[in-house]
Amino acid sequence: ETGLDSMSFMTVDRDLQQNAGMKKVIHTYTYKGAVEAVAEGKATTEKAKLTFEEKEYTVKVKQEEFEYTDEQFMKDPMVLEAGLKGAATSMVNDLNKDFFDEIAKTTTLSTYTDAIKYDDIVDAIAKMNLEDETGLFVLINPKQKAEIRKDADFKASRMGEIIHSGQIGDISGIPVAVSKKVPADTVFVATKEAVTCFVKKEVEVEQDRIKNKRINSIIPRKVGLVALTDATKAVKITKA
């Protein structure tokens, strides 16, 4: 799996925590209109139009369960701690999987040849047509780490403040982070607006027990959804 904290690369929407329901509807608005010069007593010749695209997202309940017996606990009390740690790791891995599955769906695409370098990142950013590049990040897999580190711009960049967990430095002024979840020969350039984590319920842990069998259950549970909500804010770069 990966040690990357994917939550820091997403927008987190907790609106559903304050409202009843399991669905979140998002409208993307498009305004078309132009300012006209008008003569005295005359009206504009065309009216502006506002349209919107509606997308509905339904959160999911996700949980897992592990069991241990009283006898196991008496033999080794660490079984409970180890089980809780394993369950927490499993929850994080599930979130990371959802994030990388969603960001890979972006329809904004670019390519590179040989090794990933500064120019490839610049070309990918250009496809996003951004005025403000604040918040951009680059995600690579471990095998590409050496390629990035050999890039002249990367070597010349500052290696100071670490903005994201897993970050190895900057390229073109953009933080570069490494994850095993990034597919081979693939690079993602994105902002947090690309993928949204809709949270209905934070992770909670419920316990149960079958008394006459001395079987204890630990059930971690979360309610939410990870979705690609703005494909224009993520570029998928693949090797040509």
Please provide the spans of the model-predicted regions:
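Short helix/loop capping segments that flank catalytic or ligand/cofactor-binding pockets
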Residues: 34-37, 76, 147-150, 227-229
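Alpha-helical scaffold segments that mediate packing/assembly in large oligomeric complexes
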Residues: 63, 67-131, 236-240
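Short, structured patches in soluble enzyme cores that scaffold and shape functional sites
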Residues: 70, 140-142, 222
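Extended oligomerization regions of viral-like shell subunits
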Residues: 119-205, 209
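Long, hydrophobic/aromatic-enriched structural stretches that serve as scaffold segments
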Residues: 41-75
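N-terminal "assembly arms/tails" that initiate or stabilize quaternary assembly
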Residues: 1-52, 194-202, 211-213
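Protruding loop/beta-arch "assembly-hinge" segments enriched in small, turn-prone residues
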Residues: 1-9, 13, 181-183, 189-193, ...
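Structural beta-strand/beta-sheet cores of well-ordered domains, especially the beta-sheet scaffolds
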Residues: 22-24, 64, 134-136, 172-174, ...
